[in-house]
């Protein structure tokens, strides 16, 4: 099985990159499944129903979220109605939406789980215990289990990767918007990377207008964050899972921008 994952899509620049490059990436890598983190897709924070469908039309089989899940209030009107949108599973019981979904293609089924970290982020239920619960649930249906762990702290992401090694097919980190170079296969066969990176403005600061962010650091005054304009970037990974052993065998980073050209 091959999985293509695209890191945090930020605003319309990120959506434009998805629209342009995801079809090309699917042609090049021929993934069985494509997953996109869409929690920043609407003006940098949250997701609308229109944008959800646009990401699906651009090639996503499932869309994961994070700490900005609820920033666009209209999500309450559609999150329970769309099939392949997952928000962090460790929100409290009774929260709208779901934290796991299953996607099928060519006789294969992939469980997609979304979890959110608790270090330097608003406190939620324990992601480690929730991982135990959902991995056990998913394993009854499929050996292919993908986790998007939306978290701030590198240590927390590493901890979950090691904790689920051999039980999850892949644990990929999102949220910090900067791609890390630690992609690896853990000893028991789980593909891991601390952060996939972001898809959106290249010359901003984590996708936001850099002058605004610099002003915030210099003055410590509240500012209105806006999505940066100009050059763009796309970050992702391609993960290969052996269909015999059900263990990951490869995780390759993807980075497309003016400094890292895409070759079809």
Curated annotation (Swiss-Prot):
Listed InterPro entries: Metallo-depent_PP-like (IPR029052), YmdB-like (IPR005235)
Predominant place of localization: cytoplasm
Gene Ontology cellular component? cytoplasm
Q: Provide the binding site for Fe cation 2.
A: 39, 67, 150, 175
Q: Where in the cell is it found?
A: Cytoplasm
Cofactor binding comment, as recorded:
Corresponds to iron 2 in the structure. Corresponds to iron 1 in the structure.
Phenotype of gene-disrupted mutants: Deletion of the gene affects the levels of over 800 mRNAs. Deletion mutant overexpresses flagellin and other genes of the sigma-D-dependent motility regulon. In contrast, the two major operons for biofilm formation are not expressed and the mutant is unable to form biofilms. All cells are short and motile. Deletion also results in a significant decrease in intercellular molecular exchange. Mutant displays aberrant developmental patterns and forms smaller colonies.
Please indicate if the UniProt record lists Glycoprotein as a keyword.
no
Q: Whom does it interact with, and what assembly results?
A: Homodimer.
* Name of the protein in question: 2',3'-cyclic-nucleotide 2'-phosphodiesterase
**Organism per entry:** Bacillus subtilis (strain 168)
